[in-house]
Amino acid sequence: MILIIYAHPYPHHSHANKQMLEQAGTLENVEIRSLYHLYPDFNIDVAAEQEALSRASLIVWQHPMQWYSVPPLLKLWMDKVLTHGWAYGHGGTALHGKHLLWAVTTGGGENHFTIGSHPGFDVLSQPLQATALYCGLKWLPPFSMHCTFICDDDTLQAQARQYKQRLLAWQEVNHG
């Protein structure tokens, strides 16, 4: 099962993420957990989140990039859900061997994230990749949609279809 942990503080403003979720939702065995919908008060049900993670083979962290990082509720989710003794540390093997895909949208163009005057995606992904590896997850190359503020609907739809194809390809390779 693919579990999408979706974290967008203003989901009604994001056409890109909406289209990504719509495309992913057409696939079989996909569960979408919208953190800002489930936990508007930031009071995370850790047991429910861990149960959802235990059912997944592929975990997707989908969100808009905010200040070169994750939205606050996703960071809190990581702090609360990925606990010692469950996700890491002595006895913390619940996530070992599962795959993790970082699916991120940005307002800036792809060239904005090349090494030079701005940090590149290899640098920006390091904290998430380190978290994944520490929890025994298999890190997959990230999926990113850029220029989402200025893209027309056709471009956004095409990129959202690429996201769906990425998930479908993972399903085909990992579950026949």
Curated annotation (Swiss-Prot):
GO BP: positive regulation of potassium ion transmembrane transport; potassium ion transport
Pfam families per record: Flavodoxin_2 (PF02525)
Any single Gene Ontology cellular-component annotation: plasma membrane
Keyword Chloroplast annotated: no
Reaction(s) this enzyme catalyzes, per UniProt: a quinone + NADH + H(+) = a quinol + NAD(+); a quinone + NADPH + H(+) = a quinol + NADP(+)
Bilayer topology: Peripheral membrane protein
Subunit structure: Homodimer. Interacts with KefC.
Protein name (record): Glutathione-regulated potassium-efflux system ancillary protein KefF
Species of provenance: Salmonella dublin (strain CT_02021853)
